[in-house]
Amino acid sequence: MNIIGTANITKACEEKNVKLIYFSTNYVYPGTAGNYKENDSLLPVNNYAWSKLGGESSVHLYKNSLILRVCMTEKPFVHKEAFSNIKTSFMYQEDVAKILFKLINKKGIINIGGPSMYIYDFVRKNNKLITKKNLKKNNKIGMPVNSSLNINKMKKILRWYNTGTIYLNIKI
């Protein structure tokens, strides 16, 4: 779906000259160092991430497109445990949707996410009942230890500021 389906959608958008916005993932980066910029080297960590990179490859060839490398989760967080040793740049889906409206006319690649933090710390802000879980080294699920994003490009476009609890200055 992420590769062939995206290639077909890209072709259709190009034929009709329609803007294409593709949601990719922060997992296309190696996931070891964190603070990944849009032009950093890519090395997907699992099959899902490889499929998203395949989709990106099709979209990238179309000039009227925007690739968003997104790090998001649902609110409320649906799991009872959260990793305390995995760093990421989570942002809630509803906040990503608000950002999308501000980026709709942009082109290229933009990282979308919140500040770098451990998953547990992010979730704990809204769910005090969440418990800690550690991901073991050499995990079989292909979870990177630090897939946090450099979001400076997004901040510059949005004139972002951190209010302390919500990381947006966006009104729709």
Where are these regions (language model features)?
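Amphipathic terminal alpha-helices
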Residues: 156, 161-172
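Short-chain dehydrogenase/reductase
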Residues: 40-53, 86-94, 116-117
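Mid/C-terminal beta-alpha module of Rossmann-like enzyme folds, strongest
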Residues: 99, 103-146, 150
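Substrate-positioning beta->alpha
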Residues: 70, 77-104
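NAD(P)-cofactor binding segment of oxidoreductase domains
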Residues: 1-21
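Active-site "gating" loop of Rossmann-like NAD(P)-dependent oxidoreductase/epimerase domains
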Residues: 4, 25-45
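Active-site Tyr-X1-5-Lys
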Residues: 15, 43-71
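SDR active-site strand-loop-helix element
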Residues: 20-26, 68-70
